[in-house]
Amino acid sequence: MSKFSYPALRAALILAASPVLPALANDGTIVITGSISDQTCVIEEPSTLNHIKVVQLPKISKNALRNDGDTAGATPFDIKLKECPQALGALKLYFEPGITTNYDTGDLIAYKQTYNASGNGNLSTVSSATKAKGVEFRLANLNGQHIRMGTDKTTQAAQTFTGKVTNGSKSYTLRYLASYVKKPKEDVDAAQITSYVGFSVVYP
């Protein structure tokens, strides 16, 4: 099992000309800063190839999603870490933006595709499938607060968790919710649907 250290990326947009910057033939400058931690944990769960976690939501009636923004089928899922430094503080996940991100709703696009875990999870076939109408997937904190996809780690506001010390190191269970959500202004398709999102562990 390999060890992973993930950056917490912060981006700042400079909106006005600044006298300390050289004159450039453009409308502005984007400054990107970040930090790489040498404090690492081992991802214990999911332990599968590429750490793919499959969250199976219950089969529900389309009538459970009558109104825009309605959620149903909320299902908890865990990402477990072990062999973390004992002095490490609270951790959380950052859900990465990507092809499955709906930047308008802050949710994950649902595709009419059956996920085949036994086939080593070929995710490229998911995002190339037909998009489902009227329904997406939502991630949330345990209190139901929407974790908005396609935003920075501060705006995303994923819940943090403290670790448990065992035999001189810490272990963590990072727990969140996944559910169906009614997409605005569309009737809900009845279909087998799938989506996915990458995650990074945010270190203090």
From Swiss-Prot:
The keyword Mitochondrion does not apply. It comes from the Bacteria. Keywords: Disulfide bond, Fimbrium, Signal. SUPFAM superfamilies: Bacterial adhesins (SSF49401). Coiled coil: none annotated. Residues 1-25 form the signal peptide. InterPro entries: Adhesion_dom_fimbrial_sf, Adhesion_dom_sf, Bact_Fimbrial_Adh_Pro, FimA-like. GO terms for cellular component: pilus. It is found in: Fimbrium. One of its GO terms (biological process) is cell adhesion involved in single-species biofilm formation. Disulfide bonds join 41-84. It holds the Pfam family FimA. Bordetella pertussis is the causative agent of whooping cough. An essential step in the disease process is the attachment of the bacteria to the ciliated epithelium of the respiratory tract, enabling the organism to resist normal host-clearance mechanisms. It is unclear which bacterial cell surface component are responsible for adherence but the fimbriae of B.pertussis are prime candidates for being involved in this process. Belongs to the fimbrial protein family. This is Serotype 3 fimbrial subunit. The gene is fim3.
